[in-house]
């Protein structure tokens, strides 16, 4: 069940160039959130009407807190980067579905860029039931590696080769001989497309979380659809609403 509430910022810090980590005290959202879901964050600036979708990085259900990690890319995130402890933050969530967790299977978690944060909570939820291996892809500057390492083995790929394998997450998987029974992935579309092809070629179940600009965040406006293999019951055409039907899909369900 989704909730709209005025939450409180607990803390915020910069963890890499242009990347911020914020902990939020919520009333109901944290208690119900699972790995793979997101929240919509509303701007204080009245000229910016649409909320910004941000994936959930971590959840502490006992304390009723959640963490978001985001990159500053425009007016909304620039505003948010100025929030300090005690500030109100208007949010809606938890939204979307979560990853379908498979027990008893060796998992490969793959995150690219700002698609890395959801892998922190997913690893926390999976580590007690499966072997967790995380492959994280960066342009150059690393973040969240300490959190990822608490959940299992971590393999790094950087575009410039400054850390780990030089190249893509697929290059790192091959170079480090990472194997598994199921892949969970989040990141830019070209990365997800390559992961889908790799999973298909190696007969591995693959779940992908799609990143897309959103408007309503609840499936009403059809502003964030993607092409799907089957017809959508809502529109009777071959598409899926990323905010409502996703953001997590089985890779074979959607076209990238």
Residue locations for each model-derived region?
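FNR/FR-type flavoprotein reductase catalytic core
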Residues: 75-213
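Ferredoxin-reductase
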Residues: 2-85
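Short, basic/aromatic-enriched C-terminal tail that caps enzymatic domains
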Residues: 1-3, 239-256
């Amino acid at each position: 069940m989704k909730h709209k509430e005025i939450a409180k910022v607990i803390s915020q810090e910069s963890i890499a160039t242009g990347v911020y980590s914020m902990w939020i005290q919520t009333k109901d959202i944290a208690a119900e959130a699972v790995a793979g879901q997101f929240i919509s964050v509303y701007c204080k600036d009245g000229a910016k009407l649409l909320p910004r979708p941000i994936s959930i990085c971590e959840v502490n259900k006992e304390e009723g807190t959640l963490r978001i990690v985001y990159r500053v890319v425009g007016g909304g995130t620039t505003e948010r980067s100025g929030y300090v402890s005690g500030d109100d933050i208007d949010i809606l969530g938890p939204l979307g579905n979560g990853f379908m967790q498979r027990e008893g299977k060796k998992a490969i978690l793959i995150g690219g860029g700002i698609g890395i944060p959801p892998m922190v909570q997913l690893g926390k939820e999976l580590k007690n039931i499966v072997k967790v291996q995380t492959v994280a892809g960066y342009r150059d500057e690393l973040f969240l590696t300490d959190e990822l390492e608490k959940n299992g083995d971590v393999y790094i790929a950087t575009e410039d080769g400054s850390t780990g394998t030089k190249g893509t997450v697929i290059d790192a998987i091959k170079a480090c001989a990472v194997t598994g029974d199921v892949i969970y992935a989040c990141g830019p579309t070209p990365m997800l497309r390559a992961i889908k092809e790799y999973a298909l070629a190696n007969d591995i179940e693959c779940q992908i979380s799609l990143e897309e600009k959103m408007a309503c965040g609840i499936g009403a406006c059809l502003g964030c659809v993607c092409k799907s293999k089957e017809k959508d019951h809502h529109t009777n055409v071959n598409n899926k609403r990323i905010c409502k039907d996703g953001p997590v899909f089985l890779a074979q369900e959607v076209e990238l």
